């Protein structure tokens, strides 16, 4: 896989550089919504319980597209409708988001039970965690080809 984005970063640290790209309040939630909740459209993202405002959602979708984490696709039979899918770089973030889910489930008070994501038994079981990550990734990829049969890639500006 090639490097996704070249620019000047505040340091040479990969953690800092990654946060420069996806460390805002909304980007990982959009990625989560795509692979975990199978949201694809602007309207679906805007209906998330976190209540992202439409101007910020537009900005984050465009940013994630520009850094090649997601791609914007146009429906062939409806030129006004767009769906968003993860790129290879975006798919590589699935384990990271799942690790954050597990961390939040175990470390944030009053957070458990908000979403039944099947993660409560994964914290100390590396095999179960890897199996879960593989299952979520495969589930996302399995649903993807069905959707892409009616999509056309829109070139990024």
Predicted regions and their residues:
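N-terminal helix-turn-helix DNA-binding core of bacterial DNA-binding proteins
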Residues: 13-52
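Short, contiguous, well-ordered secondary-structure segments
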Residues: 1-4, 8-9, 18, 33, ...
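C-terminal regulatory/oligomerization modules of transcriptional regulators
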Residues: 95-157
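Recognition helices and adjacent regulatory flanks at domain boundaries
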Residues: 1-11, 24-25, 47, 101-103
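Canonical helix-turn-helix DNA-binding module
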Residues: 49-73, 79
